[in-house]
Amino acid sequence: MTPSWPPTPADVARLLEALALAEERSPHYRARFAAAGFRVTELRDYDAVRARVPRTAKADLVAAQRAHPPFGDFLAAFPSELAAVHVSPGPLYIPRLADEPGGTPVLREAIGAMGVRRGEVAHVTLSYHVMPGGLRLHRAFEEYGCVVLNGGTGASALQLQVARDLGATVYAGTPSFLGRLADQARELGWDPRRDLHYRLGFSTAEALPQVLRAELEGAFGLELFDHCGEALIGPVAGECRLHAGMHLHARDLFCEFLDLATGEPVEPGGTGELVATHLGRRALPLVRYAPGDVYRLRVGDCGCGNPAPRVDFVGQVGTIRKVRGVLVHAAQVARVVAEFPELGRFQVVIEHPAGERYERATLRAGLVREAPTDLVGRLARRLKETVLLDLGVALVAEAEIPEDAGPPRYAGAMVDRRTH
């Protein structure tokens, strides 16, 4: 989705430019387009692109890089031209040219939309180890004009000491690590609001349910801004000061939101799967890449004046199941689970036992601390209020829940044991 929808001729021209570059420089896309029976010069409008250009899945990149290591046949540049390589789970290798921004221009815009001032100290706590997130944010804050504290993950007591000494006023990282910093501060005998100086927070990589947002904002006295992205795509969307949905970053991406059943573009108010094409990326361009993320498009314009469409992250294809006629989203369940500090990872197990009339869904919630006696009842009530379905609840040790069932993607959170 671009700032206008349907896309304007200028939007489509940029999209066709990106497709032509991929066809010319990437052996994978050149062969794939030929196999689909078209040349990019034959495409005239968005409808033709949607009808003829196949989607790219993460599995395509994994297979290509295994068959032709290290970068597969997607690479659209000579290896000697590369300036950096990042890694995404898979593992997948993400190369970048020296003059490719890697998402930093849109991140700088997002930082400005939060009200960050040049010269402020920004504390970046995403991982700098192999993954691209920490370095991307670091570069964006630095280029914006901030003093950057490269905290990374772990060593929370040391990070608190340094953040206090430097007077860090901007936090950037996951909401769960910010919560860990609050707990650590209290263990040190500090009051997070009094002894630390955070006033703004760039929350990313995990869901930010309203209950958790309120808890963290209350603990630190800061204002949190929700942002989303994907390692291969880069930044996708972020909140403005009105907190009325996340604005799409349309500078570097042509984003489509397609109905899960029909593949047709959804209208504002609808829910669809993200399909993204890089505009201008030359090392490893992705064409109609579908990471499996599902978004709801908001209706109307934002009062902040930014014309870019607004979205809310719903969940992932594969993390949404229909149970007794109700769509159950792993991300929706995650927001409820996040309200209970006793709980960590979870799974929703869906069954239709032989001889029983109705399907059954049970939440297996992993305990990370001792549970009060009324936890099961309170959790079941909140689930029904939010999911609009009665879910059974079973408390288990968190070690019994696989790691891929946790944030940020909840890939293993939905276990469907029905035989259809």
Region spans (language model):
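Nucleotide 5′-phosphate-binding alpha/beta core
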Residues: M1-A113, R117, G355-R364, E370-D404, ...
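Structured loop/turn residues at beta-strand edges in well-structured enzyme cores
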Residues: A13, L166, L196, L222, ...
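Active-site phosphate/ATP/adenylate-binding loop shared across adenylate-forming ligases
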Residues: A48-A219, F225, I233, A237, ...
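Generic structural signal for residues in well-ordered beta-strands
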Residues: V148, L224, C255, F346-V348, ...
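Conserved beta-strand termini and adjacent loop/short-helix elements that scaffold enzyme active sites
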Residues: G151, H227-G229, L258, E351, ...
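Conserved AMP-binding/adenylate-forming
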Residues: R199, L208, L212-D301
